A protein has these predicted regions:
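Conserved beta-loop-beta connector loops within the AMP-binding
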Residues: 148-168
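Conserved AMP-binding/adenylation subdomain of ANL enzymes
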Residues: 1-11, 15-58, 71-72
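Thr-Gly-centered strand-to-loop micro-motif
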Residues: 11-13, 37-38, 89-91, 113, ...
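Short Gly/Pro-enriched turn/cap motifs at secondary-structure boundaries
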Residues: 135-142
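Alpha-helix N-cap/helix-start capping motif
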Residues: 15, 41, 63-64, 93, ...
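Membrane-embedded alpha-helices of multi-pass transport/permease systems
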Residues: 22, 63-66
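Gly/Ser/Thr-rich phosphate-binding loop
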Residues: 5-6, 30-33, 56-61, 70-133, ...
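Generic structural signal for helix capping and beta-alpha/helix-loop junctions
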Residues: 19, 45, 68, 97, ...
Length: 168
């Protein structure tokens, strides 16, 4: 997320979920940044107002929320300006390419996807600020992470086997 001391961070995940706890509360505290915790339900006009008025610089949200904002219309987003916003990321499910381009068009920034799960304890694969975003891709393994594709194969007359694909 390239958090900086002057950042204003907003993770829209509920603190009752691991993303909300890990990245909504613990991560900004460890990074020493100001964090917005919003207890209200999703409301597109209010979310845009919060992004603008709270001068959010790094925003972490879910693809479902992004698609709901898309459905609410670009004109609603364009009713505000977001001069502080410098990085937008999503997590929780695959981010469709249209959402990445919507972010670039409406917010002026592409949306960076990433992947992790409760069992990993943190982000494993990401489109970091250092990478150009390829819509439809969640990014690359972070330093120190080896990621593989595991394929279950069955051939006629042979027992099933698992194949690990570690190179393109």
């Amino acid at each position: 997320f390239d958090m900086r001391p002057e950042d204003r961070w907003w993770c829209t995940a509920d603190p009752g979920w691991v993303t909300g706890t890990s990245y909504g509360i613990v991560a900004p505290l460890l990074a020493g940044v100001t964090s917005l915790v919003d207890r209200e339900e999703f409301d597109a006009p209010r979310w845009y107002q919060l992004l603008a008025e709270e001068r959010i610089s790094v925003w972490y949200t879910a693809p479902t929320a992004i698609r709901m904002l898309m459905k609410a219309g670009a004109e609603l987003a364009r009713a505000h300006e977001y001069p502080a916003l410098r990085f937008v990321a999503s997590v929780g499910e695959p981010l469709n390419p249209e959402a990445v381009w919507w972010g670039k068009d409406v917010l002026g920034l592409p949306i960076h996807d990433n992947w992790w799960q409760t069992e990993t304890g943190g982000i494993m694969i990401a489109n970091t600020p250092a990478f150009d975003v390829k819509p439809g891709s969640m990014g690359r393994p972070l330093p120190g992470i080896d990621a593989f594709i595991v394929a279950h194969e069955e051939a006629d007359g042979e027992p099933p086997r698992v194949r690990v694909i570690d190179a393109p």
